[in-house]
Curated annotation (Swiss-Prot):
This is Large ribosomal subunit protein uL24m. Residues 1-9 form a transit peptide. The keyword Phosphoprotein applies. Belongs to the universal ribosomal protein uL24 family. The gene is MRPL24.
Amino acid sequence: MRLSALLALASKVTLPPHYRYGMSPPGSVADKRKNPPWIRRRPVVVEPISDEDWYLFCGDTVEILEGKDAGKQGKVVQVIRQRNWVVVGGLNTHYRYIGKTMDYRGTMIPSEAPLLHRQVKLVDPMDRKPTEIEWRFTEAGERVRVSTRSGRIIPKPEFPRADGIVPETWIDGPKDTSVEDALERTYVPCLKTLQEEVMEAMGIKETRKYKKVYWY
């Protein structure tokens, strides 16, 4: 198991009931500022969509159907399943100030606002137009997305993880630990202390005699 996977397991936080998901990851500083533990916010009603029926993933090319950027196409850079949100890179943006203090007005930066899954549609790679999709199975038994207009398969994109690694295209290098080496048992439990193990490995013999120790 890689270090990034271990860090991901360790970063899981226990969320309170009726937790309101947002753009910030759970447990981050911005999320704690918006969801303090002493405030109970109203639960948000979200349309239930199973993981099997969800069809939008990071890296997909979509077209926006509503809003000021309607008709524009872009790539999905973030998916928030708990709210059925998708974020399209560089589109549906608003500007906000960060780092504002009493003596400094802050820096204005663009920030993408999320869109509901019904406000975007996948782009058919054949004619570059928005299309409805449906899930089908290939002859090999693989479940794929198929355009209802052209019948073309829309494959899932290869999108990097938070650490920048694309698992499908990753090739182990000379400094990477293989799975076999990581799972190999090399540690032998022993009751000796570290000093005693070092002395045994270097052939050092202890000539001193231990004094009796009494515990009260």
